[in-house]
């Protein structure tokens, strides 16, 4: 769990997302409150519940991007799911408890990665011994082993091919399966391979032919897993899930829309299934029970057709912090193209550089691109910042196609170039509906 202050979190998000100050502040405070709660003792720590967030705003203004960047910042188990993927219990499809099972799997991966770092030095020594064994055999004399060890460390044997035994992480063509509509079965996903490997005593291994250099990553990973206490990995992962876990529920407005159609899986039913999860319940996973009382839920939706008040009143009450994200204006588009750390313009310049083409954009070209994107959003459909990708692709279509033949040249994109390639299309509403 990271210990950034709210100001530092907002500053980090500012590098990638333009505007939306209120939303950034809300998620920054929520993330910091996780850390504050960890500093409390006993009963008070149990009583402090996370303040779940509902982000409301049109498409393409940064809701999903905020969640994506927050995941990297948090250093905590984080899962992003679309609310529309789930069905009411009793219908074939994913039930909402799968969210928590996915969160536990992510936590297991995070904890294992962190614990691998602690045993990396020891794992590297063991990996070196296994490479030597593959090179000279088990019966080689100490002098031979030392001679090969020196060559190995000097990199003289990097390209030599060896055969090694590593753990078989695949499922061997035997798929796991879910039991539809049976969340009470308390097993989540049954994996036949897991059962067979336990019955036969230990993990399966497989032979792989690889070069000495490439074998190190495989063997260090394999040896690290052998040195890890798997029970401790699970214990830490369950603790991280319960106390630091964050669930981002996207497209929540799609299950809020009222429907008169009966007989099918109810959207209201999905909301009702979400209620205990958000309020606090115990979910059975294959690693053990997980309490959801202190998991932070961030829900988001455009609410074009429905409105937040269409959600079940009980669910509204579980999302006490409301944040509205505003629609983007022309100046925001200009800033998105120029100020963000990995802006579209920087991406295209870097991509063209790989072909030996030196691409530059003038200020009036950037202004023109932003203006066209805003006009199209107003006249066709408002898809927010995503419109910039469509416009940029159209403008650079010719250059991208001819780039291999332009090696060593410089290309300047100005307002006239932008106008020539998308100006007419953007003004023709009928055409732009299909092309832009």
Swiss-Prot record:
One of its GO terms (cellular component) is HslUV protease complex. Keywords: ATP-binding, Chaperone, Cytoplasm, Nucleotide-binding. Gene3D superfamilies: 1.10.8.60, P-loop containing nucleotide triphosphate hydrolases. Coiled coil: none annotated. Its main location: cytoplasm. Transmembrane segments: none annotated. ATP binds at residues 18, 60-65, 250, 314, 386. InterPro entries: AAA+_ATPase, ATP-dep_Clp_protease_ClpX, ATPase_AAA_core, Clp_ATPase_C, HslU, P-loop_NTPase. SUPFAM superfamilies: P-loop containing nucleoside triphosphate hydrolases. GO terms for molecular function: ATP binding; ATP hydrolysis activity; peptidase activity; proteasome-activating activity. It holds the Pfam family AAA_2. It comes from the Bacteria. This is ATP-dependent protease ATPase subunit HslU. It comes from Mesorhizobium japonicum (strain LMG 29417 / CECT 9101 / MAFF 303099).
């Amino acid at each position: 769990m990271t210990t950034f202050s709210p100001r530092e979190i907002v500053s980090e998000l500012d590098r990638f997302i333009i505007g939306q100050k209120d939303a950034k502040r809300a998620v920054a405070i929520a993330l910091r409150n996780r850390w504050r709660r960890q500093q409390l003792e006993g009963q008070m720590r149990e009583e402090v519940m996370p303040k779940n967030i509902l982000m409301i705003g049109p498409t393409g203004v940064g809701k999903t991007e905020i969640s994506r960047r927050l995941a990297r910042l948090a250093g905590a188990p984080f899962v992003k799911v679309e609310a529309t993927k789930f069905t009411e219990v009793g219908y074939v499809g994913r039930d909402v408890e799968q969210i928590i099972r996915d969160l536990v799997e992510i936590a297991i991966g995070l904890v294992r990665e962190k614990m691998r770092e602690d045993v990396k030095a020891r794992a590297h020594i063991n990996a070196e011994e296994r490479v030597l064994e593959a090179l000279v055999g088990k019966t080689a004399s100490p002098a031979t082993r030392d001679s090969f060890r020196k060559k190995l460390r000097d990199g003289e044997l990097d390209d030599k091919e060896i055969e090694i035994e590593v753990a078989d992480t695949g499922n061997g063509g035997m798929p796991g399966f879910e039991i539809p509509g049976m969340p009470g079965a308390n097993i989540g996903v049954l994996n036949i391979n897991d059962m067979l490997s336990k019955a036969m005593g230990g993990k399966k291994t497989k032979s792989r032919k690889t070069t000495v250099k490439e074998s190190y990553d495989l063997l260090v990973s394999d040896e690290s897993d052998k040195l890890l206490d798997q029970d401790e990995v699970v214990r830490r992962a369950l603790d991280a899930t319960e106390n630091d876990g964050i669930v981002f529920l996207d497209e929540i407005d799609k299950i809020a829309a009222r429907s008169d159609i009966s007989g099918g899986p109810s959207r209201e039913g999905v909301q009702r299934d979400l209620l205990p999860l958000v309020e606090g319940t115990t979910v059975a996973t294959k690693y053990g029970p997980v309490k959801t009382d202190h998991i932070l839920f961030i829900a988001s939706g455009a609410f074009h057709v429905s409105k937040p008040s269409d959600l079940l009143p009980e669910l509204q009450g579980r999302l006490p912090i409301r944040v509205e994200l505003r629609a983007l204006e022309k100046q925001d588009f200009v800033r998105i193209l120029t100020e963000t750390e990995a802006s579209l313009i920087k991406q295209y310049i870097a991509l063209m550089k790989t072909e030996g083409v030196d691409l530059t954009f003038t200020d009036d070209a950037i202004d023109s691109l932003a203006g066209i994107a805003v006009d199209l959003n107003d006249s066709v459909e408002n898809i927010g910042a995503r419109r910039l990708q469509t416009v940029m692709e159209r403008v650079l279509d010719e250059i991208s196609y001819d780039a291999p033949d332009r090696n060593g040249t410089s290309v300047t994109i100005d307002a006239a170039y932008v106008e020539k390639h998308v100006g007419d299309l953007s003004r023709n509403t009928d055409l732009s509906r299909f092309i832009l």
